[in-house]
Amino acid sequence: MTEKSAELVRLNELKAFVSTKAGVKGLVDTKITEVPRIFHIPSSSTLSNNKPSDIFGLNLTVPIIDLGDGNTSAARNVLVSKIKEAAENWGFFQVINHGIPLTVLKDIKQGVRRFHEEDPEVKKQYFATDFNTRFAYNTNFDIHYSSPMNWKDSFTCYTCPQDPLKPEEIPLACRDVVIEYSKHVMELGGLLFQLLSEALGLDSEILKNMDCLKGLLMLCHYYPPCPQPDLTLGISKHTDNSFITILLQDQIGGLQVLHQDSWVDVTPVPGALVISIGDFMQLITNDKFLSMEHRVRANRDGPRISVACFVSSGVFPNSTVYGPIKELLSDENPAKYRDITIPEYTVGYLASIFDGKSHLSKFRI
């Protein structure tokens, strides 16, 4: 089969799959025993590409930080130091004692699962391929770019405080808890921005005053069990187009971050939330804080549930301009990026990350 004919076959298979609007769960419900070709990672890829240092006992672990430890001035300084080290060296860390009740964490995971396990005809009412739709269900929003497809279904929900969704726009299966959880996440986002601001050696309100906390996109994933997990990925490697991402994952696991050229498991910690530095944060901090590639491995167990909340100023019409923070610049540390708007950055983001290229690098001076 020629390369051209193989691509035509792939596109036809992709079109047939998307037209069902049943997602990956729909495939699994048919009791398939093999992963369709449109999900296969290239044969040249490997899921076990850790370096020897990882194999011979380096024991890399993503930092776990207790946000309840900053009750005194001295303790706050220690907490900020831990945040700084994690943001600079890992771009990832987990937080405990973050203020969101465990019951709310449980409820949002249950709500996400309820929606994805709804009658397919109910879910189809929310099916959309436009990432800008305020509430949308799909299997891979990046179907025009992503090859191969990822082994997951998702729904997105924009819960911007300035332009919130009307309750009736959210499916009943997850309506109340989406609204409740987004409020808690925005409060936590405010605290994290204070800590990150202080970690930069700046006023604690600088990130908030830059309007970095105006928007919230919830991306709620459902990873069905996979019969051949070594042939595909839950999510391909990528970075996030956010300032920070606040992620809730269940206990199944599969999330990995690239650190020192090794894929490191972000092992689930009961009650914890995963915080990752996004591309916008790396840009405005002039590479002081790092947005790191991460991915999700497919798993025979499942379904796996995760809720990723992208804290940003939103992708809808927004003229706010962002560039490296002036207080961080000097003759020895000049600006490494040009000023941009969030919508400008978002254009082409999906095409870049799933092509294995850094979108952020396109804006370097």
UniProtKB/Swiss-Prot annotation:
2-oxoglutarate binds at R304. SUPFAM superfamilies: Clavaminate synthase-like. Fe cation binds at H238, D240, H294. Its cofactor is Fe(2+). It is an enzyme of class 1 (oxidoreductase). Belongs to the iron/ascorbate-dependent oxidoreductase family. Its EC number is 1.14.-.-. Keywords: Iron, Metal-binding, Oxidoreductase. GO terms for biological process: biosynthetic process. This is 1-aminocyclopropane-1-carboxylate oxidase homolog 9. Pfam families: 2OG-FeII_Oxy, DIOX_N. Coiled coil: none annotated. Residues 214-313 form the Fe2OG dioxygenase domain. Binds 1 Fe(2+) ion per subunit. One of its GO terms (molecular function) is dioxygenase activity. The lineage of its organism: Eukaryota, Viridiplantae, Streptophyta, Embryophyta, Tracheophyta. It comes from the Eukaryota.
